[in-house]
């Protein structure tokens, strides 16, 4: 059996506030889902119509069972989702306070995905995948970092594209400067890179004072620096395509030959920005794997991101193909 993409990184149970606008202390109800950037991408791409697999890990606990069962129900291949003893499955609690406050609390002590090893990678036949998508957070600690590097090496040996979603989460890095050091080395192995302007700046952080996170907005940090310089430096690493997400404005695609494409977004009333970037990546993957041109692929990506910001959750609200095409047509088409 062949697959369109294998995503690598974290998986969690996500608990979303059902009380829109409530402060964390006042949350009365939570709804359950699964999450983690590579998980959201795998589920989102599967709903659109791709065959997807997840390379991650859970603990030997009921939470891990919930995660595995949910992935099965979504049709994501879990052959390479490990159950690692003496670990505890990850949990995330998410507040939703529109228009711009979305606090996150991560519970990742002894996280299973951080214990993934080279031995786990040895069991993967990369020749059955059309692409390999890496979460930047999976590079944060050993032994998962070495596993990620080896997985990338194996992917390149069978000549499938390596796609990096920078997925910057400052909380995952003990020294924020390490993030830049590791990512700059990894970028030399990438064909396609996906990130926000802030995530591009994160690759070149030299001082912790460049970073600030307010009200636990882990997914939306403020980082000082020159975005245009960061874009140029990323392209200098030799990537074929850089996709820069610019929120409501859409995105900008930078090609290796110097071509720049601005792809407009879709106007919606935002409820929750969490997961929008992952939905974007899923949409792009669908177009890319199916041979669409960059503009159309990114237009679909923007639509998926816009769809997600109107929802009260992450991948449990990811659109199916017919839904997102209807959405695009209602907004004037591709």
Predicted regions and their residues:
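A short, aliphatic-rich alpha-helical micro-motif
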Residues: 125-127, 184-187, 236
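Conserved beta-alpha-beta core of the PfkB/ribokinase-like small-molecule kinase fold
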Residues: 131, 137-229, 249-251
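Conserved N-terminal subdomain of the carbohydrate kinase-like
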Residues: 51-134, 325-334
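Glycine-rich phosphate/adenosyl-contacting loop at the front of the ribokinase-like
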Residues: 1-77, 93, 100, 116, ...
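Anion (oxyanion) recognition and catalysis
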Residues: 46, 72, 153-157, 187, ...
């Amino acid at each position: 059996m062949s697959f369109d993409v294998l995503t690598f990184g974290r998986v969690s149970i996500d608990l979303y506030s059902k009380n829109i606008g409530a402060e964390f202390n006042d949350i009365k109800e939570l709804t359950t889902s699964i999450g983690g950037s590579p998980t959201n991408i795998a589920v989102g791409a599967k709903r659109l119509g791709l065959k997807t697999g997840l390379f991650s890990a859970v603990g030997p606990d009921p939470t891990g069972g919930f995660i595995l069962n949910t992935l099965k129900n979504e049709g994501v291949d879990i052959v390479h989702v490990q159950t690692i003893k003496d670990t505890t499955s990850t949990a995330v609690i998410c507040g939703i306070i529109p228009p711009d406050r979305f606090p996150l609390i991560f519970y990742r002590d002894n996280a299973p995905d951080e214990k993934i090893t080279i031995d786990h990678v040895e069991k993967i036949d990369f020749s059955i995948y059309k692409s390999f998508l890496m979460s930047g957070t999976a590079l944060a600690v050993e032994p998962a970092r070495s596993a990620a590097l080896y997985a990338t090496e194996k992917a390149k040996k069978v000549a499938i594209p390596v796609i990096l979603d920078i997925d910057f989460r400052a909380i995952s890095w003990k020294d924020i400067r390490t993030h830049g050091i590791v990512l700059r080395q990894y970028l030399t192995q990438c064909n396609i890179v996906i990130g926000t302007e802030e995530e591009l700046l994160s690759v070149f952080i030299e001082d912790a004072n460049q970073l600030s996170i307010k009200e636990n907005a882990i997914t939306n940090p403020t980082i000082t620096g020159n975005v245009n310089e960061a874009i140029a430096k990323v392209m200098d690493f030799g990537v074929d395509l850089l996709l820069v997400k610019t929120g409501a404005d859409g995105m900008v695609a930078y090609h290796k030959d110097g071509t720049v494409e601005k792809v407009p977004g879709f106007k919606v009333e935002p409820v929750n920005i969490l997961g929008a970037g992952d939905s974007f990546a899923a949409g792009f993957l669908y177009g890319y794997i199916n041979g669409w041109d960059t503009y159309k692929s990114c237009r679909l990506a923007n639509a998926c991101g816009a769809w997600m910001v109107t929802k009260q959750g992450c991948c449990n609200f990811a659109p199916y193909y017919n839904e997102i095409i209807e959405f695009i047509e209602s907004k004037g088409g591709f």
